[in-house]
Amino acid sequence: EADGAIDSLPQALALGYDGVSHKNCKGMVKGLANAATLAEEERNRERAVHLSGEDLANVGPIALFQDLAMMAALGISHVERNGHHYFKGLSAWPESAQASMLENHDDLYRAHPEGYPTLGIKDGMLDLTSMNAAPFGPRELLDLSSLVRIDTDDPTGFISAGLPAD
């Protein structure tokens, strides 16, 4: 949680910590720099170093694909995923985008009983077969024409964007 500055990991290592957890929200380049720092550190110490991964509030489809790709690039195969607990799957996305995810990535997403796509977690795992077959994002470009423009100068509208009306 404390990996907020570019020098956080070197400071933690100097204090005796053994690693860091990557979060895409902290920056992908920072994650690569941390991985390089840990690789160098491991060459100069007897005790192992650790690079883990976590996602607190990652909402698919686009951000999830980026996060999964980054974790794979860093060699992190076990990721703490919490984002799917805080949001109603892809319910905030246009119906066309939801349908596209269920049609083209039915291994990664499943239909929630209320109809919207949600992560299809099976035995703690995500099936990435369709994602790996579409390495540059969703198999089908998402139709975003029905997204509502948000007035970022109005904090109330910005904060409530994507939240259910009820």
Functional labels for PLM-detected ranges:
Residues 112-166:
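Extended hydrophobic packing segments that form well-structured cores
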Residues 3-127:
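Shared catalytic-loop signature of beta/alpha-barrel
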